[in-house]
Amino acid sequence: MGENMKKKVVIIGGGAAGMSAASRVKRLKPEWDVKVFEATEWVSHAPCGIPYVVEGLSTPDKLMYYPPEVFIKKRGIDLHLNAEVIEVDTGYVRVRENGGEKSYEWDYLVFANGASPQVPAIEGVNLKGVFTADLPPDALAIREYMEKYKVENVVIIGGGYIGIEMAEAFAAQGKNVTMIVRGERVLRRSFDKEVTDILEEKLKKHVNLRLQEITMKIEGEERVEKVVTDAGEYKAELVILATGIKPNIELAKQLGVRIGETGAIWTNEKMQTSVENVYAAGDVAETRHVITGRRVWVPLAPAGNKMGYVAGSNIAGKELHFPGVLGTAVTKFMDVEIGKTGLTEMEALKEGYDVRTAFIKASTRPHYYPGGREIWLKGVVDNETNRLLGVQVVGSDILPRIDTAAAMLMAGFTTKDAFFTDLAYAPPFAPVWDPLIVLARVLKF
């Protein structure tokens, strides 16, 4: 192959999506020049692990899935760390690195520059002791701050996944945790009320849960001392802002890339953007929902990795389509696990479906076998076609049920298909009527 055939691929962002894209291009086209520019010193890191480092279950260095050397030496990727892309134009990018600025040419460009924490516009967010949980160094900074200032009182602002995981991280260490949630319940965008009610029951045993309160300001002299809401004030030596994230679309806008209705970069099923030879993947990109076909922005790691893989494949000439997402997600607080896949009842009604639902309580083992725990499942079905639209699970041993339900949704199962799915059974693992099968039966067909 002649020198003129070697393409230059530039990838902005060295997280899950960026490194997946880079690795895929190099595997298919080893002779191509693949450059990744990562603004921090962390590549292929696992931000989802931050709460567990704060809890003391792991260490920050373990949050890097592969060290940079693996990508540079083993995979031949030209990886630039602490390299911030400051300008993007047709055919080149300008990068700030090593104290200077440099331009690099591209034939193909991938935006994989993720999302950033949404910091509320309130007084005191810049005080010492106020943190976001965004990158592995945040975990280290939080641990060090806790030890240095002997933190006992923690306030978490936000009731989403990160808020709940951070609440566990501090409560498990015996800290006094207050959680301030603007909405009427936690995880309200992801789950229906019956499901979050069970989680909240557990939360309230370990956390001062303040629902429907708006944070007005954070106060302190040298460092944070208290959080003031429209309903009261709470002592705090440490505050976590878990108030959501937003896609980093500024660089894409410079190039005139179309921003989708969700506020993230619009992509097609090949992860191509509206600009030729420009792709986007991961938390910066929107995709389609498998059930509704609508545009959605679901910034979660498994999809981000796959989007990167798909972008890399298509750049290297091996056509591959990304089918979209179900928004499958799972988290836990202490021993209560909660997960979902597909649409909630709330979402399905909003989409115009005529739905039937069922909410059941079951056990994870037969009654005669020790170790059985409670599990609750909610199913949402299209009333006309009996097609499964979504499943939510809360309690214990939820993962096999959520993952099985996700596969069912991907395959377009009806309640009857779900009911007749031949699941495994033995007393140490599950009851003879698995909770998921019982749910299908109660949903009727």
Swiss-Prot record:
Record carries keyword NADP: yes
Q: Write down what this protein is called.
A: NAD(P)H coenzyme A polysulfide/persulfide reductase
Notes on the domains:
When compared to homologous enzymes known to reduce CoA disulfide, this enzyme shows a narrower access channel for CoA substrates, which suggests that this restriction might be responsible for the enzyme's poor activity toward the bulky CoA disulfide substrate. The substrate channel was widened by making four mutations along the channel wall (Y65A, Y66A, P67G, and H367G), leading to a fourfold increase in kcat for the NAD(P)H-dependent reduction of CoA disulfide and enhanced activity toward the substrate at lower temperatures.
What cofactor does this protein call for? FAD
Ligand binding (FAD): A16, A17, E38, A39, H45, A46, P47, V85, D283, A301, Y425
The UniProt keywords, alphabetically, are: FAD, Flavoprotein, NAD, NADP, Oxidoreductase, Redox-active center
Q: What is its EC number?
A: 1.8.1.-, 1.8.1.14
This protein's species is Pyrococcus horikoshii (strain ATCC 700860 / DSM 12428 / JCM 9974 / NBRC 100139 / OT-3)
Provide the cofactor note recorded for this chain's UniProt entry. Binds 1 FAD per subunit.
